[in-house]
Amino acid sequence: MKLTMGVHVLLYSSDADADRAFLAKVLDLKSVDVGGGWLIFGLPPAEMAVHPTDAGAPPASGPGMIGAHVYLMCDDVQATIAALAKKGVECGPVHTERWGLRTALPLPSGSALGLYQPTHPTALGMV
């Protein structure tokens, strides 16, 4: 069993409509409409790097960079939590949201990644 099936990135924006148009028209990203004007964009394969933080450094550097929440996606959150528990990882409680089931996946540093089982259409495989 794969522990994750993809990555879901949330970008916060003061002008979501403009950013959605940019993603669609400028970056040519395909999307799935999950209702209410919410678009989820397909992304190419991803990679992740771990960067150390310096005391007092902002969480993101560069003009306009305000950070992001990263969620690893899975097909079955309970089965994934059980598989992680066998590896010594204790996830937080599962919360039911209108968009899926979510929990926190703790990292050794004390930070955490989101882990969720989507209940909405996904944009995976649209690239």
PLM feature spans:
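Vicinal oxygen chelate
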Residues: 1-2, 5-14, 39-42, 59-127
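Residues that act as N-cap/strand-start positions at coil-to-secondary-structure junctions
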Residues: 25, 35, 66, 97-99
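Short beta->alpha connector loops
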Residues: 55, 76, 96-98
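Conserved active-site alpha-helix within GNAT-family acetyltransferase domains
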Residues: 17-26, 103, 112
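N-terminal beta-strand motif that seeds the catalytic metal site of vicinal oxygen chelate
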Residues: 1-20, 47, 68-70, 119-127
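Conserved short beta-strand elements that form part of the metal-binding/catalytic scaffold
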Residues: 29-65, 106, 112-119
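Short secondary-structure junctions
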Residues: 27-33, 89-94
